[in-house]
Amino acid sequence: MENTTVINIYCADKFFQTTYSTIKKCNFLTSKLIDNEIRLNIDPIHIEYLLNYLRGYLLDELCMEKIGYMIDVLPNHITINVGGKYYYLDRDFLCEYLEYFKVFTEYNKHLDPDYSSVLIDRSYVMFDKILEYNQKSTNIELYNFIKQELEFYLFKKEHLTNNQISSETKRQSIELSELPISKITNYEFIKYITKKTKTGNIVYKSIHENHYYHYCNSKILTHENTIILIKLNGSNIEQLLHNIVSFKRDYCDHTKQEDITISKLFQKKIAVHDKSNNLIIMDIELNDKDITIDFNYFNDGSVYIFHPINLINSEKTFFKKICKRVCQTITCRHNINMVKINITDFIEKITCNREKCVYIFDKIYFVIPNHNVSINYVELISSDFGNLTTSELLPSKTNPNKFMIKTLQTANKNIRFNICVDAIHRYSRNYLEIYYDLKQPVNTDINIMYKYHIIKQSY
Protein backbone atom coordinates (compact mmCIF):
# COMPACT_ATOMS: atom_id res chain seq x y z
CA MET A 1 0.00 0.00 0.00
CA GLU A 2 1.27 3.45 -0.93
CA ASN A 3 2.17 5.86 1.89
CA THR A 4 -0.16 8.46 0.39
CA THR A 5 -3.20 6.16 0.41
CA VAL A 6 -6.09 7.81 2.28
CA ILE A 7 -7.43 5.75 5.19
CA ASN A 8 -10.98 6.29 6.49
CA ILE A 9 -11.56 5.57 10.18
CA TYR A 10 -15.12 5.12 11.49
CA CYS A 11 -15.47 5.26 15.25
CA ALA A 12 -18.94 5.38 16.82
CA ASP A 13 -20.55 8.47 15.23
CA LYS A 14 -17.21 10.10 14.35
CA PHE A 15 -15.22 10.00 11.14
CA PHE A 16 -11.45 10.50 10.73
CA GLN A 17 -9.11 10.53 7.74
CA THR A 18 -5.37 10.01 7.64
CA THR A 19 -2.75 8.51 5.35
CA TYR A 20 -1.23 5.05 5.48
CA SER A 21 2.20 6.54 6.24
CA THR A 22 0.80 7.82 9.56
CA ILE A 23 -0.65 4.53 10.80
CA LYS A 24 1.64 1.94 9.19
CA LYS A 25 3.72 1.45 12.36
CA CYS A 26 0.68 1.10 14.60
CA ASN A 27 -0.31 -2.58 14.69
CA PHE A 28 -3.53 -1.76 16.51
CA LEU A 29 -4.81 0.10 13.45
CA THR A 30 -3.17 -1.79 10.60
CA SER A 31 -4.49 -5.13 11.90
CA LYS A 32 -8.03 -3.78 11.46
CA LEU A 33 -7.49 -2.24 8.03
CA ILE A 34 -9.84 -3.63 5.36
CA ASP A 35 -10.22 -1.99 1.94
CA ASN A 36 -8.72 1.30 3.16
CA GLU A 37 -11.22 1.45 6.03
CA ILE A 38 -10.97 0.89 9.77
CA ARG A 39 -14.10 0.45 11.90
CA LEU A 40 -13.75 0.66 15.68
CA ASN A 41 -16.00 0.50 18.70
CA ILE A 42 -14.05 2.65 21.14
CA ASP A 43 -14.19 6.21 22.44
CA PRO A 44 -13.60 8.54 19.44
CA ILE A 45 -11.53 10.90 21.58
CA HIS A 46 -9.00 8.08 22.03
CA ILE A 47 -8.61 7.80 18.25
CA GLU A 48 -8.11 11.55 18.01
CA TYR A 49 -5.37 11.32 20.66
CA LEU A 50 -3.81 8.32 18.89
CA LEU A 51 -3.69 9.99 15.47
CA ASN A 52 -2.16 13.13 16.96
CA TYR A 53 0.45 10.99 18.72
CA LEU A 54 1.26 9.20 15.44
CA ARG A 55 1.53 12.56 13.66
CA GLY A 56 4.23 13.63 16.11
CA TYR A 57 2.31 15.80 18.57
CA LEU A 58 3.45 15.77 22.19
CA LEU A 59 0.65 14.53 24.47
CA ASP A 60 0.35 14.93 28.22
CA GLU A 61 0.52 11.96 30.60
CA LEU A 62 -3.27 11.64 30.93
CA CYS A 63 -3.77 11.39 27.17
CA MET A 64 -0.93 8.87 26.84
CA GLU A 65 -2.53 6.70 29.50
CA LYS A 66 -5.80 6.63 27.57
CA ILE A 67 -4.16 5.42 24.35
CA GLY A 68 -1.62 3.12 26.00
CA TYR A 69 -3.52 -0.02 25.03
CA MET A 70 -3.14 0.95 21.36
CA ILE A 71 0.60 1.66 21.39
CA ASP A 72 1.91 -0.63 24.16
CA VAL A 73 3.53 2.00 26.36
CA LEU A 74 2.77 0.47 29.77
CA PRO A 75 4.74 -2.52 31.16
CA ASN A 76 2.97 -5.82 31.97
CA HIS A 77 -0.26 -4.62 30.36
CA ILE A 78 -2.33 -6.67 27.94
CA THR A 79 -5.10 -5.84 25.51
CA ILE A 80 -8.36 -7.81 25.69
CA ASN A 81 -11.53 -7.59 23.64
CA VAL A 82 -14.78 -7.89 25.61
CA GLY A 83 -17.90 -7.66 23.48
CA GLY A 84 -16.09 -5.56 20.88
CA LYS A 85 -14.64 -3.06 23.37
CA TYR A 86 -10.89 -3.03 23.94
CA TYR A 87 -9.33 -2.86 27.39
CA TYR A 88 -5.70 -2.26 28.26
CA LEU A 89 -5.22 -3.62 31.77
CA ASP A 90 -2.52 -4.87 34.08
CA ARG A 91 -2.00 -8.61 33.58
CA ASP A 92 -1.39 -9.40 37.27
CA PHE A 93 -4.50 -7.52 38.30
CA LEU A 94 -6.68 -9.38 35.79
CA CYS A 95 -5.36 -12.85 36.57
CA GLU A 96 -5.59 -12.35 40.32
CA TYR A 97 -8.96 -10.61 40.35
CA LEU A 98 -10.64 -12.83 37.71
CA GLU A 99 -9.30 -16.39 37.49
CA TYR A 100 -10.77 -16.75 33.99
CA PHE A 101 -7.86 -14.71 32.62
CA LYS A 102 -5.22 -17.03 34.08
CA VAL A 103 -6.31 -19.74 31.67
CA PHE A 104 -7.26 -17.32 28.89
CA THR A 105 -3.76 -15.81 28.71
CA GLU A 106 -2.07 -19.20 29.07
CA TYR A 107 -4.08 -20.77 26.25
CA ASN A 108 -3.56 -17.76 23.97
CA LYS A 109 0.00 -16.95 25.08
CA HIS A 110 1.17 -16.90 21.45
CA LEU A 111 -0.80 -13.63 21.10
CA ASP A 112 0.85 -11.90 24.08
CA PRO A 113 0.47 -8.99 24.81
CA ASP A 114 -2.37 -8.20 22.36
CA TYR A 115 -5.22 -10.68 22.88
CA SER A 116 -7.79 -8.48 21.15
CA SER A 117 -8.09 -10.84 18.16
CA VAL A 118 -9.90 -13.31 20.46
CA LEU A 119 -13.39 -11.98 21.15
CA ILE A 120 -14.68 -12.59 24.68
CA ASP A 121 -18.36 -12.72 23.85
CA ARG A 122 -19.69 -10.98 26.95
CA SER A 123 -21.21 -7.55 27.64
CA TYR A 124 -18.60 -4.82 27.95
CA VAL A 125 -21.11 -2.78 29.97
CA MET A 126 -21.14 -5.56 32.58
CA PHE A 127 -17.35 -5.79 32.40
CA ASP A 128 -17.15 -2.07 33.17
CA LYS A 129 -19.31 -2.78 36.21
CA ILE A 130 -16.90 -5.53 37.28
CA LEU A 131 -14.01 -3.06 37.13
CA GLU A 132 -16.12 -0.60 39.08
CA TYR A 133 -16.87 -3.27 41.69
CA ASN A 134 -13.14 -3.74 42.21
CA GLN A 135 -13.04 -0.15 43.44
CA LYS A 136 -16.25 -0.49 45.49
CA SER A 137 -16.12 -4.06 46.78
CA THR A 138 -18.45 -3.23 49.68
CA ASN A 139 -21.31 -2.27 47.34
CA ILE A 140 -23.72 -5.20 47.85
CA GLU A 141 -26.28 -3.82 45.39
CA LEU A 142 -23.67 -3.66 42.62
CA TYR A 143 -22.46 -7.18 43.47
CA ASN A 144 -25.98 -8.62 43.14
CA PHE A 145 -26.41 -6.85 39.80
CA ILE A 146 -23.26 -8.37 38.26
CA LYS A 147 -23.20 -11.67 40.19
CA GLN A 148 -23.77 -13.85 37.10
CA GLU A 149 -21.02 -12.05 35.21
CA LEU A 150 -18.61 -12.43 38.13
CA GLU A 151 -19.28 -16.18 38.16
CA PHE A 152 -18.45 -16.41 34.45
CA TYR A 153 -15.06 -14.79 35.04
CA LEU A 154 -14.49 -17.21 37.95
CA PHE A 155 -14.53 -14.52 40.59
CA LYS A 156 -15.57 -15.54 44.09
CA LYS A 157 -16.47 -12.81 46.53
CA GLU A 158 -14.86 -14.62 49.44
CA HIS A 159 -11.57 -14.87 47.53
CA LEU A 160 -10.74 -11.22 47.88
CA THR A 161 -9.55 -9.24 50.86
CA ASN A 162 -8.30 -5.88 49.58
CA ASN A 163 -7.82 -7.44 46.13
CA GLN A 164 -5.75 -10.34 47.51
CA ILE A 165 -6.79 -13.98 47.78
CA SER A 166 -7.42 -14.61 51.44
CA SER A 167 -5.44 -17.24 53.34
CA GLU A 168 -8.71 -18.84 54.50
CA THR A 169 -9.79 -19.43 50.90
CA LYS A 170 -6.38 -20.90 50.08
CA ARG A 171 -6.67 -23.24 53.06
CA GLN A 172 -10.13 -24.40 52.02
CA SER A 173 -9.24 -25.00 48.36
CA ILE A 174 -8.46 -28.48 47.11
CA GLU A 175 -6.35 -28.87 43.99
CA LEU A 176 -6.98 -32.44 42.84
CA SER A 177 -3.72 -32.54 40.91
CA GLU A 178 -1.88 -32.43 44.25
CA LEU A 179 -3.64 -35.51 45.63
CA PRO A 180 -1.74 -38.85 45.69
CA ILE A 181 -3.89 -40.51 43.07
CA SER A 182 -2.45 -41.56 39.74
CA LYS A 183 -5.27 -40.76 37.33
CA ILE A 184 -6.41 -37.56 38.93
CA THR A 185 -3.00 -36.00 38.39
CA ASN A 186 -4.07 -35.50 34.74
CA TYR A 187 -7.05 -33.40 35.78
CA GLU A 188 -5.36 -30.03 35.97
CA PHE A 189 -8.65 -28.20 35.54
CA ILE A 190 -10.58 -29.50 38.53
CA LYS A 191 -10.70 -27.32 41.60
CA TYR A 192 -13.30 -27.60 44.31
CA ILE A 193 -13.87 -24.75 46.72
CA THR A 194 -15.28 -25.22 50.20
CA LYS A 195 -18.05 -22.93 51.27
CA LYS A 196 -19.47 -22.54 54.78
CA THR A 197 -23.27 -22.83 55.03
CA LYS A 198 -25.55 -21.42 57.73
CA THR A 199 -25.61 -24.81 59.47
CA GLY A 200 -21.84 -24.92 59.65
CA ASN A 201 -21.47 -27.81 57.20
CA ILE A 202 -19.02 -27.54 54.31
CA VAL A 203 -20.52 -27.91 50.84
CA TYR A 204 -18.24 -28.62 47.89
CA LYS A 205 -19.02 -26.88 44.66
CA SER A 206 -17.24 -26.92 41.35
CA ILE A 207 -16.14 -23.60 39.91
CA HIS A 208 -17.83 -24.82 36.70
CA GLU A 209 -21.41 -24.61 37.96
CA ASN A 210 -22.94 -25.87 34.71
CA HIS A 211 -21.10 -29.17 35.00
CA TYR A 212 -21.97 -29.89 38.60
CA TYR A 213 -24.58 -32.55 39.33
CA HIS A 214 -26.18 -34.03 42.42
CA TYR A 215 -26.03 -37.81 42.41
CA CYS A 216 -29.40 -39.53 42.94
CA ASN A 217 -29.29 -43.34 43.32
CA SER A 218 -28.24 -44.11 39.75
CA LYS A 219 -27.49 -42.21 36.57
CA ILE A 220 -26.62 -43.05 32.97
CA LEU A 221 -23.17 -41.73 32.10
CA THR A 222 -21.63 -41.59 28.65
CA HIS A 223 -18.35 -39.88 29.45
CA GLU A 224 -14.87 -41.34 29.56
CA ASN A 225 -14.13 -40.17 33.08
CA THR A 226 -16.24 -39.30 36.07
CA ILE A 227 -15.19 -37.71 39.33
CA ILE A 228 -17.30 -38.80 42.30
CA LEU A 229 -17.11 -36.80 45.52
CA ILE A 230 -18.40 -38.15 48.82
CA LYS A 231 -18.80 -35.62 51.59
CA LEU A 232 -18.98 -37.51 54.90
CA ASN A 233 -21.39 -36.38 57.59
CA GLY A 234 -19.46 -38.18 60.33
CA SER A 235 -15.80 -38.83 60.96
CA ASN A 236 -16.08 -42.64 60.85
CA ILE A 237 -15.01 -43.96 57.46
CA GLU A 238 -14.85 -47.67 58.31
CA GLN A 239 -18.48 -48.41 57.44
CA LEU A 240 -18.18 -46.63 54.13
CA LEU A 241 -15.17 -48.67 53.04
CA HIS A 242 -17.34 -51.79 52.83
CA ASN A 243 -19.97 -50.16 50.64
CA ILE A 244 -20.32 -51.63 47.18
CA VAL A 245 -20.17 -49.66 43.98
CA SER A 246 -21.98 -51.48 41.16
CA PHE A 247 -21.05 -50.84 37.54
CA LYS A 248 -23.70 -52.11 35.12
CA ARG A 249 -22.54 -52.12 31.51
CA ASP A 250 -25.38 -52.40 29.01
CA TYR A 251 -24.94 -54.43 25.84
CA CYS A 252 -27.34 -55.51 23.12
CA ASP A 253 -28.07 -58.99 24.40
CA HIS A 254 -27.09 -58.98 28.06
CA THR A 255 -26.07 -56.82 30.97
CA LYS A 256 -22.75 -57.27 32.70
CA GLN A 257 -22.42 -56.11 36.28
CA GLU A 258 -19.23 -55.59 38.27
CA ASP A 259 -19.25 -54.96 42.01
CA ILE A 260 -16.34 -53.47 43.89
CA THR A 261 -16.00 -52.09 47.40
CA ILE A 262 -14.71 -48.60 48.08
CA SER A 263 -11.90 -50.23 50.04
CA LYS A 264 -10.74 -51.91 46.79
CA LEU A 265 -10.90 -48.58 45.00
CA PHE A 266 -8.54 -47.21 47.63
CA GLN A 267 -6.15 -50.12 47.14
CA LYS A 268 -6.11 -49.57 43.38
CA LYS A 269 -5.51 -45.83 43.93
CA ILE A 270 -8.74 -45.01 42.13
CA ALA A 271 -9.99 -43.27 45.26
CA VAL A 272 -8.39 -41.11 47.92
CA HIS A 273 -9.50 -39.91 51.35
CA ASP A 274 -8.94 -36.25 52.10
CA LYS A 275 -8.88 -36.46 55.89
CA SER A 276 -8.62 -32.74 56.59
CA ASN A 277 -11.85 -32.03 54.72
CA ASN A 278 -13.56 -35.38 55.43
CA LEU A 279 -13.97 -36.04 51.72
CA ILE A 280 -13.59 -39.09 49.50
CA ILE A 281 -12.70 -38.49 45.85
CA MET A 282 -12.98 -41.23 43.22
CA ASP A 283 -11.81 -41.10 39.62
CA ILE A 284 -13.74 -43.66 37.56
CA GLU A 285 -12.70 -44.34 33.97
CA LEU A 286 -15.62 -45.38 31.77
CA ASN A 287 -14.94 -46.69 28.29
CA ASP A 288 -18.36 -48.16 27.51
CA LYS A 289 -21.03 -46.30 25.61
CA ASP A 290 -23.66 -46.72 28.34
CA ILE A 291 -23.03 -47.49 31.97
CA THR A 292 -25.07 -47.21 35.14
CA ILE A 293 -23.39 -46.68 38.49
CA ASP A 294 -25.40 -47.79 41.52
CA PHE A 295 -23.99 -46.39 44.72
CA ASN A 296 -24.97 -48.30 47.88
CA TYR A 297 -24.47 -45.56 50.40
CA PHE A 298 -26.43 -46.04 53.70
CA ASN A 299 -26.87 -42.32 54.48
CA ASP A 300 -23.27 -41.72 55.48
CA GLY A 301 -23.08 -38.38 53.71
CA SER A 302 -23.70 -36.56 50.45
CA VAL A 303 -22.57 -37.79 47.03
CA TYR A 304 -21.78 -35.55 44.09
CA ILE A 305 -20.57 -36.37 40.60
CA PHE A 306 -18.63 -34.24 38.17
CA HIS A 307 -17.88 -35.19 34.59
CA PRO A 308 -16.58 -33.25 31.61
CA ILE A 309 -18.69 -32.33 28.62
CA ASN A 310 -16.35 -32.28 25.67
CA LEU A 311 -17.46 -29.18 23.80
CA ILE A 312 -14.88 -26.84 22.33
CA ASN A 313 -14.86 -23.14 23.11
CA SER A 314 -11.51 -21.40 22.93
CA GLU A 315 -12.63 -18.65 25.28
CA LYS A 316 -13.41 -20.91 28.23
CA THR A 317 -11.21 -22.74 30.67
CA PHE A 318 -9.35 -25.97 30.01
CA PHE A 319 -10.99 -29.23 30.90
CA LYS A 320 -8.19 -31.74 30.66
CA LYS A 321 -5.13 -32.63 28.67
CA ILE A 322 -4.47 -36.12 27.32
CA CYS A 323 -1.05 -36.87 25.84
CA LYS A 324 -0.66 -39.62 23.26
CA ARG A 325 1.84 -40.83 20.70
CA VAL A 326 0.72 -42.28 17.37
CA CYS A 327 2.52 -43.75 14.36
CA GLN A 328 0.94 -43.55 10.93
CA THR A 329 2.37 -44.84 7.65
CA ILE A 330 2.05 -43.03 4.34
CA THR A 331 2.83 -45.17 1.29
CA CYS A 332 4.31 -43.42 -1.74
CA ARG A 333 3.17 -45.55 -4.68
CA HIS A 334 5.13 -43.65 -7.30
CA ASN A 335 8.38 -41.75 -7.54
CA ILE A 336 7.43 -38.33 -6.21
CA ASN A 337 9.20 -35.30 -4.83
CA MET A 338 6.26 -33.86 -2.89
CA VAL A 339 4.41 -35.82 -0.22
CA LYS A 340 0.97 -34.38 0.57
CA ILE A 341 -0.98 -35.27 3.74
CA ASN A 342 -4.33 -33.92 4.87
CA ILE A 343 -4.16 -33.12 8.59
CA THR A 344 -7.82 -33.99 9.07
CA ASP A 345 -6.90 -37.56 8.11
CA PHE A 346 -4.64 -37.57 11.16
CA ILE A 347 -7.51 -36.54 13.36
CA GLU A 348 -9.90 -39.12 11.93
CA LYS A 349 -7.43 -41.79 13.00
CA ILE A 350 -7.55 -40.41 16.53
CA THR A 351 -11.22 -39.77 17.19
CA CYS A 352 -14.55 -39.33 15.47
CA ASN A 353 -15.35 -36.31 17.68
CA ARG A 354 -12.56 -34.00 16.60
CA GLU A 355 -14.82 -30.95 16.41
CA LYS A 356 -15.37 -31.15 20.17
CA CYS A 357 -11.73 -30.91 21.18
CA VAL A 358 -8.54 -29.03 20.52
CA TYR A 359 -5.68 -31.24 19.32
CA ILE A 360 -2.20 -29.77 19.57
CA PHE A 361 0.60 -31.71 17.93
CA ASP A 362 3.66 -31.31 20.14
CA LYS A 363 6.08 -33.15 17.87
CA ILE A 364 5.97 -34.65 14.41
CA TYR A 365 8.61 -37.08 13.17
CA PHE A 366 9.15 -38.53 9.71
CA VAL A 367 11.01 -41.79 9.20
CA ILE A 368 12.07 -42.62 5.63
CA PRO A 369 13.66 -46.07 5.19
CA ASN A 370 15.86 -44.95 2.31
CA HIS A 371 19.16 -43.59 3.71
CA ASN A 372 19.66 -41.40 0.65
CA VAL A 373 16.42 -39.47 1.02
CA SER A 374 16.22 -36.20 2.91
CA ILE A 375 13.63 -33.45 3.23
CA ASN A 376 14.17 -29.86 2.12
CA TYR A 377 11.32 -28.22 3.99
CA VAL A 378 7.74 -28.62 5.16
CA GLU A 379 4.82 -26.37 4.27
CA LEU A 380 1.43 -26.05 5.93
CA ILE A 381 -1.11 -25.35 3.18
CA SER A 382 -4.71 -24.16 3.60
CA SER A 383 -7.31 -24.51 0.86
CA ASP A 384 -8.61 -21.06 1.76
CA PHE A 385 -5.45 -19.13 2.64
CA GLY A 386 -2.65 -20.86 0.77
CA ASN A 387 0.77 -21.26 2.38
CA LEU A 388 0.50 -20.62 6.12
CA THR A 389 3.90 -21.79 7.36
CA THR A 390 7.23 -23.05 6.11
CA SER A 391 9.59 -25.14 8.21
CA GLU A 392 13.04 -26.57 8.12
CA LEU A 393 13.65 -30.09 9.40
CA LEU A 394 16.26 -31.39 11.77
CA PRO A 395 17.57 -34.97 11.39
CA SER A 396 17.75 -37.13 14.49
CA LYS A 397 21.21 -37.66 15.99
CA THR A 398 20.47 -41.32 16.68
CA ASN A 399 18.62 -42.14 13.46
CA PRO A 400 19.68 -40.45 10.19
CA ASN A 401 16.37 -41.45 8.59
CA LYS A 402 14.31 -39.70 11.24
CA PHE A 403 13.42 -36.03 10.80
CA MET A 404 11.70 -33.67 13.21
CA ILE A 405 10.16 -30.30 12.57
CA LYS A 406 12.55 -27.73 14.01
CA THR A 407 11.02 -24.31 13.47
CA LEU A 408 8.31 -22.75 11.40
CA GLN A 409 8.01 -19.23 10.12
CA THR A 410 4.35 -18.41 10.70
CA ALA A 411 2.70 -16.22 8.11
CA ASN A 412 -0.50 -15.78 10.09
CA LYS A 413 -0.24 -15.15 13.84
CA ASN A 414 -3.46 -17.06 14.48
CA ILE A 415 -1.93 -20.26 13.11
CA ARG A 416 0.88 -21.68 15.18
CA PHE A 417 2.95 -24.76 15.19
CA ASN A 418 2.42 -26.95 17.19
CA ILE A 419 -0.52 -27.64 14.85
CA CYS A 420 -3.69 -26.52 16.58
CA VAL A 421 -6.70 -28.21 15.00
CA ASP A 422 -9.05 -25.62 16.42
CA ALA A 423 -7.25 -23.08 14.26
CA ILE A 424 -7.31 -25.49 11.33
CA HIS A 425 -11.10 -25.62 11.44
CA ARG A 426 -11.35 -21.83 11.53
CA TYR A 427 -8.91 -21.20 8.72
CA SER A 428 -9.68 -23.98 6.29
CA ARG A 429 -13.21 -25.06 5.52
CA ASN A 430 -12.16 -27.70 3.01
CA TYR A 431 -8.74 -29.09 3.84
CA LEU A 432 -5.43 -28.25 5.38
CA GLU A 433 -2.42 -30.21 4.20
CA ILE A 434 1.23 -30.70 5.02
CA TYR A 435 3.58 -30.74 2.05
CA TYR A 436 6.99 -32.38 2.34
CA ASP A 437 9.46 -31.32 -0.33
CA LEU A 438 11.97 -34.16 -0.81
CA LYS A 439 15.42 -33.76 -2.29
CA GLN A 440 15.01 -37.04 -4.18
CA PRO A 441 11.91 -38.86 -5.47
CA VAL A 442 10.78 -41.75 -3.27
CA ASN A 443 8.80 -44.93 -3.79
CA THR A 444 8.52 -46.31 -0.28
CA ASP A 445 6.67 -46.10 3.02
CA ILE A 446 7.16 -43.01 5.16
CA ASN A 447 6.33 -43.44 8.83
CA ILE A 448 4.90 -40.34 10.43
CA MET A 449 4.97 -40.34 14.22
CA TYR A 450 3.28 -37.57 16.08
CA LYS A 451 2.91 -36.82 19.76
CA TYR A 452 -0.10 -34.73 20.59
CA HIS A 453 -2.31 -33.69 23.47
CA ILE A 454 -6.04 -33.16 23.56
CA ILE A 455 -7.60 -30.29 25.42
CA LYS A 456 -11.23 -30.85 26.33
CA GLN A 457 -13.00 -27.71 27.42
CA SER A 458 -16.14 -26.46 29.11
CA TYR A 459 -18.80 -24.21 27.76
Swiss-Prot record:
Top-rank taxon: Viruses
Domain BTB span(s) in chain numbering: 76-143
PROSITE patterns: BTB
Signal sequence segment: none
GO biological process per UniProt: protein homooligomerization
Pfam families listed in its UniProt record: BTB_2 (PF02214)
Gene3D superfamilies in alphabetical order: Potassium Channel Kv1.1, Chain A (3.30.710.10)
Similarity remark: Belongs to the mimivirus BTB/WD family.
Protein name (database record): Putative BTB/POZ domain-containing protein R541
